[in-house]
């Protein structure tokens, strides 16, 4: 699973949910096909791993998968039935902050229909709406 090796600060503020479109990571740089986010969300390291496994199982050594997002934000949680106060909880899991327009996964070395099906299987593991995009086209987020 993806987690940072070292972090400067163990705990972070949660921040406000995403306003606006992704600034970077909107183009396909490595593969031929990509999976684009259409909604803002926090994607956990477990969800990224589940999507990766779903894709690699479908393509069966045929192609290469690139993960373009990295979970670098720690999310803390307090134990169940704990009284309020006594500080912030311990980091429980890590998330990647994803905004609309962001390419999350890329795929190369397979046919378009295999790539489409692999991305569809991966999208079922993610908590947001996504869109399949090809290398040449710069995807518009408002298209369904």
From Swiss-Prot:
Keywords: Ribonucleoprotein, Ribosomal protein, RNA-binding, rRNA-binding, tRNA-binding. InterPro entries: Ribosomal_uL16, Ribosomal_uL16_bact-type, Ribosomal_uL16_CS, Ribosomal_uL16_dom, Ribosomal_uL16_sf. The keyword Ribonucleoprotein applies. It comes from the Bacteria. Residues 1-23 are annotated as: Disordered. CDD domains: Ribosomal_L16_L10e. SUPFAM superfamilies: Ribosomal protein L16p/L10e. Residues 1-16 have a biased composition (Basic residues). GO terms for cellular component: cytosolic large ribosomal subunit. GO terms for molecular function: rRNA binding; structural constituent of ribosome; tRNA binding. The keyword RNA-binding applies. One of its GO terms (biological process) is translation. PANTHER family: 50S/60S RIBOSOMAL PROTEIN L16 (PTHR12220), LARGE RIBOSOMAL SUBUNIT PROTEIN UL16M (PTHR12220:SF13). Binds 23S rRNA and is also seen to make contacts with the A and possibly P site tRNAs. Belongs to the universal ribosomal protein uL16 family. NCBIfam families: rplP_bact. Part of the 50S ribosomal subunit. This is Large ribosomal subunit protein uL16. It comes from Pelotomaculum thermopropionicum (strain DSM 13744 / JCM 10971 / SI). The gene is rplP.
């Amino acid at each position: 699973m993806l987690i940072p090796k070292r972090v400067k600060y163990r705990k972070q503020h949660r921040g406000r949910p995403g306003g606006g479109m992704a600034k970077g990571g909107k183009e396909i740089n490595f593969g031929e096909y990509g999976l684009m986010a259409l909604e803002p969300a926090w994607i956990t390291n477990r969800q990224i791993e589940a999507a990766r496994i779903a894709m690699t199982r479908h393509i069966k050594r045929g192609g290469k998968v690139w993960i373009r997002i990295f979970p670098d934000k720690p999310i803390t949680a307090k134990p169940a039935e704990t009284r309020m106060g006594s500080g912030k909880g311990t980091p429980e899991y890590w998330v990647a902050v994803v905004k609309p327009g962001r390419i999350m996964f890329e795929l190369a070395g397979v046919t378009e229909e295999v790539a489409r099906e692999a991305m569809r299987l991966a999208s079922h593991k993610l908590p947001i709406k996504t869109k399949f995009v090809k290398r040449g086209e710069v995807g518009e987020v408002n298209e369904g």
